[in-house]
Each structure stands twice: as structure tokens, then as C-alpha cells.
């Protein structure tokens, strides 16, 4: 968890390269947004939803293949719902929703695995690990009647992937708007978009929406790839991101992967069969 040494890291308007060295956030964001004009011309056409998203990024089908296992991980995680922090409790500058109506369970942040969290959802993390280039992954849990105000990411060249796992029974009443494009989620139907485009979310139902979010860098030609690689390493090794990683780790008990749970059930069934066989009365000679 957060230590005294980095308790101030994440102050609004600052980006911490080390505990004591920070730079103003706004110039960095402005540079990224200016670069995004260059990068955007080299990005795939986004946003894309459903089949179109999987055609453009077939490797993301790994999540659909593991849908049931990921859903089982999520159901286990939601038993510990009250322990899952709000986004602003993990990243204080990101106050897009008041209170705890938007909770996030981070698995990976800019290349740092949060081992305490991935142990609770092993099959989910295994599926994510089969997708090359993923640097950030999390469960995004939005409560009923919550709204995420318009915002935009500052990391140009990052592709964001939403994989819906729990959606309200009236999906058209829980939606996201991305750069003027209106989408609503359906379970198992992915959505891919450019995080630097302004987007906002509204849940007009009394039901919870949960999506698995993963971020990865788009392939860029030389020399643009040098810029995105430099930015990635600066962010990854910053005290800012390390502080987020530490805050995000919570104490949800570990869960065995599905294969181990299945092996345990088989072993248990065999043991019960053996016990029943050995305890069965033999034929009497009298």
C-alpha cells in the first residue's frame, strides 16, 4: 500500500518522475495531444465495436475464448466488492466520479503487474498475458445511475479495449460516447477506441456495468515509435506510476486457476469413490 515517502505523489497538476522531481502535468498532456495529430494519421480507424473490432485486432479474440473463465474470476472478485477502491483512491488526479460509484481493480499498470491482484483472478491474467503488448489492464466497475464526466487520455498512440462482462438488462441505457460516436455495451462484444479522443459514460439504470479494460500501444513507424517508446519508459519508471501500483494492491484472497480447481474436483471425486469402495460391506460367509 501507499507509503509515507510517496504520500504526496499524484498531486493534481503534477507528474512525478521521482519522489522529489516533478513536472507540470499540462505541458506533458499538451505535447502528447499535439503528437496525437501526427500519430492519429498512423492509427487504425477507430472506434470499432463487435465483429469489426475483432477483425481489426484478431489477437483480442483470446478474451472471448476465455469468457467463461474471466466471468468466473469476476464473480469471485465481486464477493469482495467493498474492498475494491474507487479510481480516485488509486490515482488522486482522476476525479471523474464523486464517491465510490466508479471502482477499479488494477491488474497491470504501464507494464507493472500487481501480483496481489492478479492472484485473485488468475484465469483473467493468463488470457491477458497471451495478448502481446498489453501494458495496462483492469476491471472497471460502474454503479447504477453513475456518470463519468467527459475526459480524454494524454498518451497518444494507446489503443483502449473494452471487453464487457456485466451489462444492465437494458443495455441501450448504459452507454459511452467517444468523439461524437455513441456506443452501448453488450456482454462479450468488444469495443476499441483511441483514449485521447474525448469520451464520457452514463449509466441510466440501477444496475452495475463491468468491463475489462486493456491498453496497448499501436504499432508506429520510425521515428514516431522512438517517441512512443521513450514516453512509455518515462511513464513506466516514474514514481507517479509506482505510487498508483502500490495504492491499487488490495487484499483479495488468491484464487486457483480453473485447471487446478478442476483437478481438485476430480481428485476429490476419486477419493470419495475409493472411500465408498473400501467401506462397502463384503459378502458374509455365514
Residue ranges, per PLM feature:
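Fe(II)/2-oxoglutarate oxygenase catalytic core
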Residues: 1-152, 209, 223-286
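Short, conserved beta-strand element in jelly-roll/cupin
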Residues: 141-144, 154-170
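Short beta-strand His + acidic residue motifs that chelate non-heme Fe in jelly-roll/DSBH
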Residues: 148-151, 193, 199-205
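A short hydrophobic beta-strand segment most commonly corresponding to one strand
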Residues: 160-164, 192, 207-223
